[in-house]
Structure formats: structure tokens, C-alpha cells
Curated annotation (Swiss-Prot):
Keywords, ordered alphabetically: Ribonucleoprotein, Ribosomal protein
Protein name per UniProt: Large ribosomal subunit protein bL27
HAMAP family in the record: Ribosomal_bL27 (MF_00539)
Organism field: Aliivibrio salmonicida (strain LFI1238)
A GO molecular function held by the record: structural constituent of ribosome
């Protein structure tokens, strides 16, 4: 008779759900007020003109226009702004 002993246990087998972070509207895209531009942890991107920042550091459009990404300042920070159409 073929028998199989009990298998051992494992301490792995878990993973967290992905948070779907990243850029949601790219440079040159048209946005409406309230549209989410970037979901992020911390300020990888900073809010420029016509862009608001949420409590979880989400950047969103405050007015209608086109998205513009730029690097500026002495620390070469990335800014996201909205150029009004």
C-alpha cells in the first residue's frame, strides 16, 4: 500500500493587495477640475499652479486645462501644473 506522510507547514503564502499608484494623467493630456493626476506615497511630485494636494499626497486638478510636468528649483524637484486652455 502506498502511503504519504503529512506534509510540513509553511510560513509564506501572503501578499498585500497592489495600491494602483502612479501617474494617471500624462503631460499634454486635458483634464477637468477634480481629475486625479498622480497617486503617490509622499511627495515624489509636487503641486504646481492649479494643482491641489490631498491628505494622502494625491495630486488633482483645480481647474480645466492641460497637464504639464516640469523639473525646477535648486533641488531639481518634479512639479505638476495645469496650463489653462
Amino acid at each position: 500500500m502506498a502511503h504519504k506522510k503529512a506534509g510540513g507547514s509553511t510560513r509564506n503564502g501572503r501578499d498585500s493587495e497592489s495600491k494602483r499608484l502612479g501617474v494617471k494623467r500624462f503631460g499634454g493630456e486635458s483634464v477637468l477640475a477634480g481629475n486625479i493626476i498622480v497617486r503617490q506615497r509622499g511627495t515624489k511630485f509636487h503641486a504646481g499652479t492649479n494643482v491641489g494636494i490631498g491628505k494622502d499626497h494625491t495630486l488633482f486638478a483645480l481647474s480645466e486645462g492641460k497637464v504639464k510636468f516640469e523639473v525646477k528649483g535648486p533641488k531639481n524637484r518634479k512639479f505638476v501644473s495645469i496650463d489653462a486652455e
